[in-house]
Amino acid sequence: YGVRGKRYFAVGFPNVTGGYEIRSRFFKGCVPPKDVSLVKAEGSPADVCSVFEGFMDFLSAATLGLEKGDCLVLNSVANVEKAMRYLDGYGCIDCYLDHDAAGRRTLKTLKGHYGERVYDRSALYDGCKDLNEYLQLTTKKEQ
């Protein structure tokens, strides 16, 4: 993309309605429309869907080998209602949400709608803001 004659580069992550979440070291934004992103597992239909707030957390889960089944990225906790039409068919919903008020509200909303099918997986990264921060810290320790 370009701003005032300068060229910049970013990673784009597509959503279900044709928009993109855009990230670089210097920029965080989206190309509308804003919506959730769904990544389907290869092979037969999945009974498990892992839910992430942002695509960096999804990529962190992939790096850590955590994703099993399908994955849904909210791209904003404001999209939790939009996510529900995609989550209805899953027997297990694994939530890797941020350790903040918005993440807790989102988990509460999902548990209120899906009950015992929702699992909070955030204990994995206790002491970190989110899964991406956990990956960064564990990667630094290994170096």
Q: Which residues does each predicted region cover?
A:
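Phosphate-handling DNA/RNA-contact segment within nucleic-acid enzymes
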Residues: 2-88
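TOPRIM fold recognition
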Residues: 47, 63-143
